[in-house]
UniProtKB/Swiss-Prot annotation:
PANTHER family linked: 4-HYDROXY-TETRAHYDRODIPICOLINATE REDUCTASE 1, CHLOROPLASTIC-RELATED, DIHYDRODIPICOLINATE REDUCTASE
Source organism superkingdom: Bacteria
Gene giving rise to this polypeptide: dapB
A molecular function (GO) term: 4-hydroxy-tetrahydrodipicolinate reductase
Protein name: 4-hydroxy-tetrahydrodipicolinate reductase
EC number: 1.17.1.8
The family this protein is said to belong to: Belongs to the DapB family.
Amino acid sequence: MRRIAVMGAAGRMGKILVEAVQQRAPLTGLTAAIVRPGSTLIGVDAGELASLGRIGVPLSGNLESVAEEFDVLIDFTLPEVMLKNLAFCRKAGKAMVIGTTGLDAAQKQLLAEAGKDIPIVFAANFSVGVNLSLKLLDMAARVLAEDADIEIIEAHHRHKIDAPSGTALRMGEVIANALDRDLQKVAVYGREGHTGARERETIGFATVRGGDVVGDHTVLFACEGERLEITHKASSRMTFAKGAVRAALWLDAREPGLYDMQDVLGLH
């Protein structure tokens, strides 16, 4: 059995991750669940909090206190929290599955450095459908090449705090790499006022926030006389959680390295 710990187990995504881990029993088992220090929920059964019934795993407020109880940590928390957990797992030799978004270049470099010592799967989106979309985007960009104007439109719920989404940025990276462009130089984030004509090599991003939208992403390849749209719509966060658990299983006995969901699915 793959022993899995969930960080942020009392949060919206954390409770779904707890459920997803339990759904894969006996291949996986939730053996630790961590919440923020000082939380009033410390000691509460993680299964009961996730409406699964009692599973015998009390919420802990300290990762170090459960270090001997898990093999891999699933972490979808904020960047500053995740990086502290990364440092601990690197020192303790624990594998990680990381779904944190909003990382800057320096923070991503810390992930790469940690990957020299422990196996890590880091992805902006753990949905199988999204990762298949990334493969399709690579193909479309290479075939359409300079003939298409490319725009990425994403929509999420009102509570999401980073924009564009990590998934939208990853889509942009895949397209830019396929076209041998530097995304930092060609990305255009929103348009307003008198912008002038569209520069041909740019990749545009548009962001929508509202309601309870789980996650919609559309990439538009606009050519002369035709348009190609590649769209993915998530209707439940469980799709992300199931992908994260799949990644945790894939990491079993894996050599140290920084992997992504494309590696897990064999799409590279």
